[in-house]
Amino acid sequence: MPFNGEKQCVGEDQPSDSDSSRFSESMASLSDYECSRQSFASDSSSKSSSPASTSPPRVVTFDEVMATARNLSNLTLAHEIAVNENFQLKQEALPEKSLAGRVKHIVHQAFWDVLDSELNADPPEFEHAIKLFEEIREILLSFLTPGGNRLRNQICEVLDTDLIRQQAEHSAVDIQGLANYVISTMGKLCAPVRDNDIRELKATGNIVEVLRQIFHVLDLMQMDMANFTIMSLRPHLQRQLVEYERTKFQEILEETPSALDQTTEWIKESVNEELFSLSESALTPGAENTSKPSLSPTLVLNNSYLKLLQWDYQKKELPETLMTDGARLQELTEKLNQLKIIACLSLITNNMVGAITGGLPELASRLTRISAVLLEGMNKETFNLKEVLNSIGIQTCVEVNKTLMERGLPTLNAEIQANLIGQFSSIEEEDNPIWSLIDKRIKLYMRRLLCLPSPQKCMPPMPGGLAVIQQELEALGSQYANIVNLNKQVYGPFYANILRKLLFNEEAMGKVDASPPTN
């Protein structure tokens, strides 16, 4: 439609991950190291999904690159529709003061000014208006279902551009009447949310403004139709998602053999860390060293997933198999970092003034809310964490003293307050013992969560010191486990091939690096 092609973008309010079912059969080979070693050592997988190849690099054509891009785009869109219940298309308006916004406004206004001058000329010129009605007719017809023949015939009859041109040649065309018919038809086809827009159209007197607003409302109706289609498609897509994603990724892999390089490095990093941990355990005095240490594929893969909760999403590229969930994982990681700090602050407060404030749950709840509010946006580059932690410390002292005074008890002395604020501010320092303790306990909880069958019928026990964030951590953990379990179902065969290569072929030839991990 003329000058009204608003840019479409993806609306993603809050991610809502679908519950994933149990591992697919192809993932069963990862369930335990004790399963048949021979099956892992075999070379039954397709060569295109192997993490390494000895053949020379193949020249990739432009068409192959474009085919891969289309497959990746389709895979990403299908995944987003299936797992994000809030996914919808929205119109993104350009900022009014931006150059693009000003240019768009000027060009649009110029078009409608020309149309206004043509319709008010003597004699009037109708050619541009007729073209607009022709486009309106096609849009209205696109809303009809295959069975809507009666309305289809009526629209084609009333908005017959050949007939309208003949009427225009004899100055007998009724532009206002045609516009009224269009508005009436739009009222029959639109969603209830557009009823108010239709009423406003009927109340508009200027014919040029009516046509302008008709196109605006038609744009909204097209967006409504697209979102309705997405909503209708979602249940079917959810049922077919695992097979669809796996097939699409296999197509990408066939076009781009290097499409698993980052994934291989991600898993290899976990293998090296586990081997180093086992080698250190073997050197511990009194440890039995009767046989060569073995790694469980499930343990390696779960540890790889745990690394995603400490991923530097700004500097480090995600594994290819997790690209579709990158935004969700980043959001969970950022939220988890906030929960870690809240747990640290609560633990410090309990250690220092718990004896004084014990039995005051309303105070603990208020302090937690204050911390959560002040820590909002802590993952932004402009956020000064040390300054905010200092502010939380000061506010904590104020709230504690206020509560003590209300109960006629002595307030905290200056030394305790300074110590409390200092410990709060030191949380961000490297190797802080409180942070390390909370981080270790959260990792333990998440590791236990990944070991549960999917879907989770009950949550694992909450480690000590995390009660203050239990509700939020359980919700976050459930979302995280859903992402991981669905990812395992989809990409299980690819992970099996990589682990088969890393844990058996390379281990047998002594190729796995057991040096200390660098990060």
Swiss-Prot record:
Its main location: cytoplasm. Coiled coil: none annotated. GO terms for cellular component: cytoplasm; cytoskeleton. The modification Phosphoserine is found at S16. It is found in: Cytoplasm, Cytoskeleton. One of its GO terms (biological process) is signal transduction. InterPro entries: Tcp11. Interacts with FMNL2; this interaction promotes muscle-derived satellite cell (MDSC) migration and differentiation. Promotes the migration of muscle-derived satellite cells (MDSCs) during differentiation throught interaction with FMNL2 and therefore may participate in microfilament assembly. Belongs to the TCP11 family. This is T-complex protein 11-like protein 2. It comes from Homo sapiens (Human). The lineage of its organism: Eukaryota, Metazoa, Chordata, Craniata, Vertebrata.
